Amino acid sequence: PVAENLRAEPREFGRLIQDAVGIEAIVNRVTVHESAEVQSEWFQSTHDDYGIENIVLVGGESSNIDYLGPSVVESSELISEINSEPGREIFCGGIAIPSRKVESLRLLKKGSGGIEYFTTQVLYDSDNISKMLGHYQDVCMKEKVSPKRILLSFAPISTERNLNFLKWLGVNIPEATEEYITANQDTIKGRSLEVSMGVLDDVLSHISS
């Protein structure tokens, strides 16, 4: 049902946030479903027409599928070409999915291919992200490269419908966490915030240990 709803233009929403709050917006862009030419035009328009300089590139669901459009690394190369033109500077990011196997190696490859930073999938558990950060640090030290910045993503909810939407998006929510958050409809918002803050505290403790 979500896929059938009319979606707003994310760049327009990003521009509204920038104008209203005064902070730079980050817009996600799936790269694989349209040609390199279309993607390049979209990147240029995002910068020139919407004033958005931060784009997170999102690839396909499987490396076994032959997609029409460019990969994340190929898209970052397109952005590098755009950035070579006077007056254009797009900061190019990628997605980190902590629950995915050997994600640290994917981050290393994408970082070497031009990705400047990563945003995580929405976090409702600290175990996978802590492991991923540790593994990523290890592989970067082994390869003698500097780790890229990783931005942690949180999306507290206020209703069970919000939670179901996150699950539809593929967010990993442990069963025990879901049961705790939804045990009482009147406390979903508070418990969701509590879980998000707990995950952040756990990750910060892991990093500093």
Language-model-detected regions and their locations in the chain:
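Conserved, mostly hydrophobic/aromatic
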Residues: 46-47, 110, 114, 152
